[in-house]
Amino acid sequence: MPVITVDLAVLPDRAVKQRLIESLTSAASQSTGIAEEKFIVLLNEMPRDNIGVGGKLLSDLVK
């Protein structure tokens, strides 16, 4: 079973997570020819205080 892992800042709600998982699964299935049912998608959410961009905390960059 193919696994898609995404590291990202905390998403605002369940609906956004669902759309992301559906989109990733669909794109991967179309690209590889592997059935959507075979894909596992893991979302690793991190607080914005734990992410740095250009030497700054993401929480300071996104308000």
Where are these regions (language model features)?
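A domain-level signal for the structural core that forms small-molecule/cofactor-binding pockets
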Residues: 1-63
